[in-house]
Amino acid sequence: MLGLIKETIDRLRYKIPLRPRQIQIEITNRCNMDCPMCQREDLGIELEHMSWTHFATVVDKLGQRENITLTGWGEPFIHPRVFDMIAYCKERGHKVMVTSNGLFTKPSMVDDILNSAVDTITFSIDSVNGNETVTDGHTSNKVYENIEAVVKGRKPGTLGVRLQATLHANCDNDLYDVIRYGARIGCDIINVGRLDRQFRPNLERPDAQQERSIFLKADEIARSCGIQLDWLQ
C-alpha cells in the first residue's frame, strides 16, 4: 500500500522512475483475427515472428524480477515457441503476462497454458453477444469456451485471468455484459480501454459526457458483481 501511495505521489509530481514498471515484448505481429480497430495492417511493416535469438538477447539485457508482457499487434499464442519464451523468462525470475484474443489454433492450447508458468493471461473481448469480428470460419463461441476452460482449469492461487474490453460508441451494454460475464465465470479483473482511432477515423467512441456516465454505471455493476474494474486510459 505504501508503495502504491508513493507511486501515485510521484506521478502527480511528474517524477519519472529510473526503470519502467513493465516491459512489453511483441513476439509476433501476425494474427488469426482481423479486428476492425486493429492498426496492424496500417503500419506498413513486415508481418513476422520474433526470432528466438532476438528474444533471448532482449530478455538477457533485463534485470531481475521484471514484469514482462508478451503482447503487441499480433496474437502471441500463434508463435511456435511462445511457451519456450514464457519458460525462459520465468527461469530468470521474471513475472510473465500474455494478452490473447482467445482464438486458439490447436486443441492442446488450454492445457499448454495451464501447464506453463505464465502468471497472468488477459483475453481481449469486447462483447459476449457474438459481435467480435473473426475470420477463417471461426466463431466467437469458441473464444468463450477457451476462456472458460482456462478459468475453470487453473489451480487456486496460480494463473491470473483478466478480460480486456475496448469501449466503442453505442456499445455500453456490451461492456456491462462483459463485466457480468467475467464475474460469473470467475475472472479476476476487467480492464477497459479507449478506442484508438488514429488509423480508423470512421470508428466512433463515446464523448466525454457519455464516457463519464458509462464509467459510473460500469463501476456500479462491477461492485455489485464483486469483480475489480480497471480503466487503462
Identify what each model region corresponds to:
Residues E26, E48-T53, R92, D111-Q233:
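Radical SAM enzyme [4Fe-4S]-AdoMet core and its adjacent flexible, acidic
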Residues M1-T120, V134, N141, P201-A222:
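Conserved alpha-helical substructure of the radical SAM core
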